[in-house]
Regions:
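Well-ordered beta-strand positions
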Residues: 41, 142, 177-178, 196
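N-terminal subdomain of nucleotide-sugar transferases
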Residues: 1-67
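A conserved catalytic-core segment of Leloir-type glycosyltransferases
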Residues: 5-6, 50-121
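Membrane-proximal helix-turn-helix segments that form the acceptor-binding/catalytic region
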Residues: 31, 108-115, 136-137, 160-179
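An aromatic- and histidine-rich active-site surface loop
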Residues: 29, 103-107, 123-138
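A short, histidine- and acid-enriched strand-loop-helix "catalytic/donor-clamping" loop
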Residues: 20, 132-133, 147-159
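Carbohydrate-associated surface elements
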Residues: 182-185, 202-206
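Active-site proximal beta-strand in glycosyltransferases
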Residues: 12, 41, 125, 136-152
Length: 206
């Protein structure tokens, strides 16, 4: 079981697995709030998603509507001083072309924002496999991969090939300096990067 030290004076760019404005805050939100309160500069990047659901999925239109509302907020500052941003992306990840377009779009947008906000040598905290293409592109000092789901098994939320999601997940495991699992079962089933893997269980933040 890992207890994260509370440090200060660092820069953190977190690619969350969901939008900051989601009605049920996830563990990444609580962690980033604590880091910001401790005196760290934090940028939280709203979910760049695993792709949109299929056209037949009833969640397609609500997902698009929620994402458009996030885009409308642009870069916003929370009460804790966290910069929350929804970068423009192409919502399809099944092809090399679309992934290349996305990581270039995001690299430019987040890189410029980090420079304006004074972030240097950030800790890159990724909580979704599609952020793996950003590793090595934001001048980061450390890469943390926060695993909170079996991403390739969650096919209800997107139409992307599970095999592609699995490949991205395995790349993230191979390239991360530190891997945090939010569940004991997820950690028990892990096969890659075990020497860098730790359990960070979710809890209620009062």
């Amino acid at each position: 079981l890992t207890y994260l030290p509370i440090f200060s004076g660092k820069s953190i760019i977190c690619f969350g697995g969901e939008d900051w404005w989601y009605h049920h805050p996830h563990s990444k939100n609580h962690l980033m709030r604590r880091f910001a309160r401790a005196g760290n500069k934090v940028i939280f990047v709203n979910s760049i998603s695993l792709g949109l659901p299929s056209l037949r999925n009833k969640d397609l239109l609500p997902r698009i509507a929620r994402k458009l509302r996030s885009y409308a907020k642009l870069a916003r500052q929370t009460d804790e001083g966290i910069t929350v941003v929804s970068p423009a992306t192409v919502p399809f990840f099944g092809s090399r072309l679309s992934r290349g377009m996305n990581h270039n779009l995001i690299r430019v947008q987040i890189g410029q924002l980090a420079k304006r906000r004074g972030l240097t040598k950030p800790i890159l905290w990724i909580a979704i496999p599609t952020a793996v293409d950003l590793i090595g592109r934001l001048d980061e000092s450390l890469v943390v991969y926060h695993v909170s789901d079996k991403y390739d098994a969650n096919t209800m939320d997107h139409a992307t090939d599970p095999r592609e999601i699995r490949r991205l997940h395995e790349r993230a495991l191979q390239q991360a300096d530190l891997i945090l699992y939010s569940g004991r079962k997820l950690l028990a089933e892990a096969e890659i990067g075990l020497e860098r893997s730790h359990l960070l269980e979710q809890a209620v933040d009062f």
